[in-house]
Every structure is written in C-alpha cells, then in structure tokens.
C-alpha cells in the first residue's frame, strides 16, 4: 500500500484511498461489520460480483467523456488488475471485473493520476451524471449541456448531503427535445431549453422529478418547464436534502425517490424543498462554461492518404455511423460496441487515433457504444480504414441491431438468466434474417438479466427480462417479453407492457413473430408504437401465448444461452444499495468520524459542509440509541420524531439547547450556513454525542 501514499497530489483524494485501504485491513481483521464495510466499499466503486473472492470495479466517467490519456490509463489499470476487458454501462461508466479486493486502493490511486475517480460510482449516492453523447455538437441543441453535467458532478462529489442516502440517485442531461438522455426515467432529468427574458436569450432546463425503472417503473413529473441555469445546483441540493431526510432506509425495495414522491405527492415534496432553502450552500450558482467553449484544435494537420477499396461498405458506414456536427466541417463517428465489451489492445489504438488525428475526445454512450467527436471531413476515409482494423466499422450504430444488455449472469449477483447470450443470438437473427432492419433507428431492443432493469428492458420497444420457469422438478431459463415502450421526446416516455414469460431458447422466435406480424399488417409508413397501440396489448399477448407452453420442452431448453449444462438458478445478494445491520458500537464510532469531518470542514471554512456533517452525526447518534431500544429507524425524519418520544419526553436524556430534539436538529433549516451557526451547531452536536455516550455506558453498567 505504500507505493501510492506520496503520489496523490490531492489530499482529499489521498485520504479517500488511504481510508479504503485501512478499512479493508480492519475488515480482514474482523473489526468492521461486513454490512458496514460493504456500504463503504460500494461508495468507492467496489462492487461484489457473482464469482467469489473478486470484485467488479466501476469507473465513474461523468457524461462518458474520456481523453486519450484517460483511456490509456484505464487500459493499463485493466491489464494490471483485471483481465483486459472493458465494459461500457448504460450510465456511461466503464466496469472491469475479477479484481482482488486488496488491490483496489492501488488501482484507484493509478486512475487518479489522470483525474479518474471511483468515488460514488456505486452505493447509496449520486451515481454517474449522464448526458446526451452528442451534447456540444448537436445541430439542434439550444446550448451545450456538458458544462452543466460537469458542474453537477463536481459539486455533489463527496458532498455531505448525499453520502449516505436511503438509495441511489440518478440524474441526466438531454441536449435536445429528443431526450436521448432519458429524463423521464431519472430521479432528476434535465432537458436544455432557451427562453427570451427581457429581450435576451437565457439558458435553462425543463426539469423532471421522480422517475425510475426497476420492477415498478414510474414516469417522472415535470416540476419546471423552464428553470434558469443558475438555479440548477440549488434545486438539486434541495431535492437531495429532502430525499436524505424523508427517504425510506429500511425497506430497500421502497427506498428510491419515486416511492417518496408517490407517498407525499409532488406539491408536498416541493414544499419540503422550499423549507430547506435557507440552508442551501448557494441561493444561485452561475456555472462557468468557458472551458467548454474553447476552439477545437488538432495535434497535426497532416492527413494520411488512403484508398477505400469497398466503397459500398464505406458509404453504408457513413450513412449509419457518421453524424454531422454543428461545427462546420466536423463530424462524429459512432462505433457500435457489441454488448458494450471491448479490450485494452483496441482501446489503446483508439486512444492514439483520437489524440493524433482527432481532438482528443470520445464519449461512451448510454447505449453502450463509443462516439468519436470532432473528426475533420477529409480524415473520415482514414478513420474508416483504421477503425476497420479494430473491427469498429460495423454499420447500425444506435439501430435495432444495436442491442442493449446488462452483464447478467456473466458476472452479476442478481442475474437470473443470461442477457448477453440472448442478445448475441438476437443480433445474429437480425443480421441473417432481417437485413432491412440493420439501420432501423426507430426500434430498440433492450435486455436485463433480472427485474432491476440495468439493461432498461422495460422502456424498450421490445424488451426481455431474465427469469426462470419451473417445469416438473426442473428449472428452465426464461424470458419475460415486453412490448410498447420508448422515448416520445421532450420529457415524455412510455414503459413497456409485460406480455408473456417464455423459455429463453424461444426468445429468437418471439422476435420473429413480432417483426413478421408488424411487416405483414402495418399500414403504409406506420410506426411500430402506433401499430402496437392500434392492435392493443391483448392482440400481442395472443400472438405470443403459444411460446409460453412448457409441456413440450426439449433438453436444450433447460440450458441457458452460452451454456452446455442444465440451468441452475443462483441469485446472490444485491449491492446497488447497502442492507445495513445496525450495530450500536459501530454507529457511535461512525458518529465520531462524522464529528471529525464536521470539525475539519469548519477549519477549512466550509460552513455548509460542516453543518451537514454535524447533522449527520446527530442523526447517526440518535439512531444508535433507538436501535438499541428496538425502535424503527426507517427515515431520518422518523428518527427525529421517535427520539423525542422515547428519550426527550421521558427525560432520559436532556439537551444542552433545552429544546425538543426536533427543534435542536431542525436548526439546520432555520439558519443560513454562516460561520457562527456552523460553530454553534458543531458544539451542540459534540455535547449531544457526549450525553448519549454517557447514557449508553450507564445503561451497559446496569
């Protein structure tokens, strides 16, 4: 562990990495509870996988942006600590697998040399900020949302208000009304808008709140048709503060923001946000966009001369994979990456290409692809030749034949049946039997290995969810077929209808049935969703019902795609959020750490951060005593109320503030984040912790 101790220039990052290393050692020594340790490592991008003894590492790449240097660094890390395979996720991250837990701190330290983080890539935190991959180059965009996504990432990274929420929190930025970043299915979704105010064009966002997929998808609500850009950060802060305080914590399946919105309603939720305004770090927060407005430059003006031999393939590639940018003479190249998987040898060659002949930028996309940006028109033939050598010129970027799929049973604990195996087979069927659909961008197929929808199956035109079906004494891998979802645009979307559950090996036939029926019966130029609505859910159920019959299964039906042995259902424990075992001593120890964090923030004159660390320490301390009493601690608001009832009203504990516990805690939203209040709140927090610690010691003695 010594090798990286003096190589990290940023002391905050160094502290993070050293803390992870220290906690790993304490965990191995049995000094940290497994569930508490899991919460810590998840917040550092370290995720358990299906195979025992190794970890998946999620590398957080805001809005998918990567430079040549960063891609080289990721490739080096993958070769050194993993197996050389890179997986692009539907949140524009990169995942690598089969990493030893002991080596994760040094892996992280290597990534930080090129400003790449693991922090909050997993766990109950603000996940990677996604954005349209065409942001900044889209001919139809009002403005580039990239600097706003970037500012959001930086502002909330390590921010105390969102370190230990009840569940993960996802945000997206769409460049245009096409809503390619899928605002309607996010906790907070933003769509770029421009509005004339006082005779001048102003930048802002349409804002959507409370969306999500999973087993119970919810369409987000529009809360602002136009939010001025300088109110973006304060608005997000308010939503996060309310979610942190009122969100469910004990029942994981009901802990996402969408369930809180459903419970209290949008108006009441926004009222709670207003109550927090006095505590905001900033009342408005102008975002500097100048770094994103620099002239696009190229390392060399030299253009290698090449000769295209197969002009038909080249023209087909240009038609389906090349996008004209709003910058005159520049184009973006879409690279279709099968299942989002590619290897470090190709990654390095690609990194060299964009450095020498591009503008040193690419973006990983929400559909698990790569978009190479800022390519001069005259270099397109050269790029085609070079990308062809890498196997990166397959046409059909963002088309029906560009299937989205999560890793499923390959590596994920929660995978029920293979998602990558069926995806490969469906792509084979489309290429060989439906070549006319290769460049069809109207339809999308998405696949998830379980109900959690990491592959976004329940918002696809045609979706598949991994399941199992019992046949006698045996289990067969199965797929639930969903139809009718999609992106409408401008914040509107559709969730797919669940139709039938079929054996996995019949997945290709279900696709044939759907496409053949559409081709045979659609009206002229009728779109798929229009056709689906016209025919209705029952029609499609009847169309597919025969495939659900399990009375005539063959031996092959009991083997999943890509396997030669009978299917075994093996589901582990999910780690998207920590399931917490509350040990009293551990909770109080964590309270001490939070008080220390509050003190450090105060000494650095970060008043707002110090106040929230103090608040977290108070809640954590109260939770410890309530847990010891067997009281519910589902929400922070519930903890505050219960502590008054159980300890203050019964005179078991007295507060230095001589108030109710609620009045003591809620000073946080009654005061602006000043030095004086931060100091007072911190001292009151220390006094409260001391009183609780004394009470507990006395209780243990008796």
What role is predicted for each listed range?
Residues 606-610, 626-629:
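Charged, well-structured alpha/beta interaction segments
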Residues 1-597:
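Peripheral terminal and linker regions in Fe-S/redox and tRNA-modifying enzymes
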Residues 241, 616-627:
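Short, hydrophobic/amphipathic alpha-helical patches that form generic packing surfaces
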Residues 153, 240, 515, 599, ...:
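Structural signal for well-ordered, non-membrane alpha-helices
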Residues 595, 602, 607, 614-615, ...:
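Inward-facing hydrophobic residues that define packing positions of alpha-helical scaffold repeats
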Residues 579-581, 585-600, 622-702:
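Long, charged low-complexity segments
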Residues 526, 608-612, 634:
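Short, solvent-exposed positions on alpha-helices
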């Amino acid at each position: 562990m010594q090798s990286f101790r003096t190589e990290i220039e940023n002391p905050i990052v160094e502290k993070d990495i050293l803390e992870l290393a220290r906690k790993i050692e304490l965990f191995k020594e049995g000094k940290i509870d497994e569930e508490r340790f899991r919460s810590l490592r998840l917040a550092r991008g370290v995720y358990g996988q299906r195979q025992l003894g190794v970890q998946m590492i999620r590398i957080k790449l805001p809005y998918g942006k990567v430079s040549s240097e960063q891609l080289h660094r990721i490739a080096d890390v993958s070769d050194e600590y993993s197996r050389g395979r890179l997986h692009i996720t539907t949140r524009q991250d990169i995942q690598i697998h089969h990493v030893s837990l002991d080596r994760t701190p040094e892996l992280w330290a290597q990534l930080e040399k090129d400003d790449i983080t693991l922090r909050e890539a997993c766990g109950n935190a603000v996940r990677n900020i996604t954005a349209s991959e065409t942001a900044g180059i889209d001919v139809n965009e009002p403005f580039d949302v990239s600097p706003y996504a970037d500012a959001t990432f930086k502002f909330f990274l390590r921010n105390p208000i969102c370190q230990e929420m009840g569940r993960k929190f996802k945000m997206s930025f769409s460049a245009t009304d096409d809503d390619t970043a899928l605002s309607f299915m996010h906790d907070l979704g933003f769509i770029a808008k421009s509005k004339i105010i006082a005779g001048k064009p102003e930048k802002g966002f349409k804002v959507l709140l409370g969306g999500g997929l999973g087993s119970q998808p919810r369409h987000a609500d529009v809360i602002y048709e136009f939010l001025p850009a300088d109110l973006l950060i304060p608005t997000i802060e308010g939503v996060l503060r309310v979610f942190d305080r009122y969100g469910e914590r004990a029942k994981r399946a009901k802990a996402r923001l969408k369930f809180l919105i459903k419970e209290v309603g949008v108006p009441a939720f926004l009222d709670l946000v207003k109550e927090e305004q006095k505590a905001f770090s900033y009342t408005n927060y102008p975002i500097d966009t100048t770094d994103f407005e620099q002239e696009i430059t190229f390392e060399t003006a030299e253009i290698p001369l090449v000769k295209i031999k197969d002009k038909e393939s080249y023209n087909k590639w240009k038609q389906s994979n090349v996008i004209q940018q709003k910058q005159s003479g520049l184009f973006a190249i879409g690279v279709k990456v099968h299942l989002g998987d590619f290897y470090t040898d190709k990654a390095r060659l690609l990194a060299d290409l964009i450095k020498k002949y591009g503008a040193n930028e690419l973006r990983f996309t929400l559909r698990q692809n790569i978009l190479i940006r800022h390519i001069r028109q005259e270099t397109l033939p050269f790029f085609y030749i070079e990308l062809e050598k890498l196997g990166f010129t397959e046409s059909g970027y963002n088309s029906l034949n560009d299937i989205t799929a999560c890793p499923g049973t390959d590596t994920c604990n929660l995978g029920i049946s293979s998602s990558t195996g069926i995806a490969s087979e469906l792509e084979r069927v489309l290429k060989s039997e439906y070549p006319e659909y290769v460049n069809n961008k109207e339809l999308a197929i998405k696949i998830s290995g379980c109900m959690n929808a990491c592959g976004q199956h329940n918002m696809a035109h045609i979706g598949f969810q991994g399941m199992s079906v019992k046949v006698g004494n045996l289990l067969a891998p199965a797929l639930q077929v969903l139809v009718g979802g999609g992106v409408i645009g401008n914040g509107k979307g559709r969730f797919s209808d669940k139709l039938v559950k079929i054996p996995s090996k019949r997945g290709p036939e279900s696709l044939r049935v759907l496409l053949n029926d559409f081709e045979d019966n659609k009206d002229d130029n009728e779109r798929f969703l229009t056709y689906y609505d016209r025919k209705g859910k029952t029609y499609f159920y009847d169309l597919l019902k025969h495939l659900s019959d399990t009375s005539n299964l063959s031996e092959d039906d009991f083997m999943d795609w890509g396997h030669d042995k009978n299917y075994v259902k093996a589901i582990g424990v999910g780690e998207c959020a920590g399931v917490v075992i509350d040990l009293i001593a551990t909770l109080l120890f964590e309270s001490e750490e939070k008080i220390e964090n509050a003190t450090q923030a105060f000494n650095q004159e970060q008043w707002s951060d110090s106040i929230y660390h103090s608040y977290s320490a108070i809640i954590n301390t109260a939770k410890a005593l309530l847990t010891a009493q067997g009281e519910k601690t589902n929400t922070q608001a519930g903890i505050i109320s219960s502590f008054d009832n159980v300890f203050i009203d019964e005179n078991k504990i007295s507060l230095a503030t001589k108030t109710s516990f609620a009045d003591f805690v809620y000073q946080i939203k009654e005061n602006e984040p000043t030095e004086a209040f931060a100091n007072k709140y911190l001292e009151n927090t220390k006094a409260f912790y001391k009183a609780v610690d004394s009470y507990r010691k006395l209780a243990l003695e008796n």
